[in-house]
Regions:
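Glycine-rich loop(s) and the adjacent beta-strand/alpha-helix scaffold that form part
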Residues: 1-55, 59
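FAD-dependent oxidoreductase catalytic-site/capping-region signature
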Residues: 30-35, 47-245, 253-258
């Protein structure tokens, strides 16, 4: 209503309950081997383009994240963290473009699988092409802050292991000067980013739940012949990647509709 749009049906849960995986990177320099940073610089990048075109091999033939790990933290009975590992280091700008670091290195990111923080997505105007106002509210609970710092410490433990120390040089990120929990948390706030797993803004739930948007057949509460079929119907964040469960929702929706 504040944007001059007539309300036909009110569901306060629409746009609320936004959840996402929040990742934090640790990068370490290495003293030997060829990393993606090296492969992305001239003249190797040109050679790698032709290598892929003619042989479908080389660094362009495999994903950036080569290793994934689910692991338990302090007191956990099931995995609470996910790590992605990349044989390259670099920086990402505000547009999502990545530039290689000025030295050979490797990168890992960790995310808390079941965060408590909740955000929202709201419209800004009557213009459907206008970008919405997206507020994730990352690290807005004590639990999320504490567990995210714990995840960063686990990454450092991996890099401190003897096999890696044989090729390690300096820690590029966080940096040796970042040691206390408060310093690590400050780094997380400045350097953390999305894993691109947003869900929950049209959550499934019983009609008695004032924040529920759809029922167990994906039908919008209180409306006829309207369903929502995407990741927004998940009440809680998936403990892993969201693509496969979203495909499963679409397949189920096809069965319900047809």
């Amino acid at each position: 209503e504040k944007h001059g749009i007539e309300v036909k049906h009110e569901l306060p849960g629409v746009g609320e309950n936004l959840q996402d995986h929040f990742m934090v990177a640790v990068q370490h320099g290495v003293n030997r081997g060829v990393t993606l940073g090296c492969d992305g610089q001239f003249p190797r990048v040109v050679l790698n383009v032709f290598k892929y075109l003619f042989t479908k091999r080389g660094p362009l033939a495999f994903p950036a994240a080569n290793v994934g790990v689910f692991f338990k933290g302090e007191g956990d009975t099931r995995p609470s963290f996910q790590i992605h590992f990349t044989p390259g280091a670099g920086d990402m700008d505000e547009h999502g473009n990545t530039a290689p670091a000025d030295q050979p290195g490797v990168n890992s990111t960790t995310c808390l699988l079941r965060p408590e923080s909740r955000g929202h997505v709201h419209i800004r105007s009557t213009d459907p092409k206008s970008p919405p106002a997206i507020q994730y509210n990352y690290l807005s609970t004590e639990y999320d802050r504490r567990r995210t710092v714990e995840g960063v410490k686990w990454q450092r433990k991996i890099y401190a292991a003897k096999p890696f120390q044989e090729i390690a040089t300096t820690e590029i990120k966080l940096g040796a000067h970042v040691q206390t929990d408060e310093q690590i948390l400050d780094y997380c706030r400045k350097e953390g980013s999305s894993v691109y797993h947003p869900i929950g803004t049209c959550k499934m739930g019983a009609a008695s739940d004032p924040m529920a948007v759809v029922d167990n057949e994906l039908r919008v509460h209180g409306l006829h012949a309207l369903r929502v079929v995407d990741a927004s119907i998940f009440p809680y964040l998936i403990s892993g990647n969201t693509h496969a469960p979203t495909v499963a929702v679409a397949e189920k929706a096809a069965d319900l509709i047809l």
